[in-house]
Amino acid sequence: MNTLKMQRRIAAELLKCGENRVWIDPEKVDEVASAITREDIRRLIKEGVIRKKPIEGQSRYRARIRHEQKKKGRHRGPGSRKGKKTARMGKKELWIKTIRALRRELRKLKEQKKIDRKTYRMLYIRAKGGQFKNKHQLYLFLEEHGLLKK
């Protein structure tokens, strides 16, 4: 078989694409092999012996399936995670989530008259200072110091 390296290169330049995208009619290889000038190649392009292949896009098929799976909670285990814990949820977001839960709980306890105003204020400030990591620790503190009213 003839090597059509030079013809392919010239055709790529004329078609304004890469050499891999140049399609040469396999039945007219000899005709292409005899073409040695740019003008010859231009004529073959006009005749349709040499064509430009379409761009092959990147298929989203697998990506869509993976996205659907992730919606269901698959592929989210520790082995699939990259980066720090804070890369998924920032420190500030985490703090907001925690403090809102604690303040909600304190408000609920105050409304139910399980703690008085002074205790509420003291616990509110301690929560702001980061003394309680979660609601469980808040309740442990309340029980330890006997601050909960029955």
From Swiss-Prot:
Annotated segments matching region Disordered: 59-89
GO annotation terms (biological process): translation
UniProt key word Ribonucleoprotein: yes
GO MF terms held by the record: large ribosomal subunit rRNA binding; structural constituent of ribosome
Keyword terms: Ribonucleoprotein, Ribosomal protein, RNA-binding, rRNA-binding
Biased composition (Basic residues): 61-89
Matches recorded under Gene3D superfamilies: 1.10.1200.240, 1.10.1650.10
Pfam families from the UniProt entry: Ribosomal_L19e, Ribosomal_L19e_C
InterPro entries: 60S_ribosomal_eL19_sf, Ribosomal_eL19, Ribosomal_eL19_CS, Ribosomal_eL19_dom, Ribosomal_eL19_dom1
GO cellular component, one term: cytosolic large ribosomal subunit
HAMAP family in the record: Ribosomal_eL19
Similarity annotation: Belongs to the eukaryotic ribosomal protein eL19 family.
SUBUNIT field: Part of the 50S ribosomal subunit.
Function of the protein: Binds to the 23S rRNA.
Protein name: Large ribosomal subunit protein eL19
Organism expressing this protein natively: Pyrococcus horikoshii (strain ATCC 700860 / DSM 12428 / JCM 9974 / NBRC 100139 / OT-3)
Species lineage: Archaea, Methanobacteriati, Methanobacteriota, Thermococci, Thermococcales
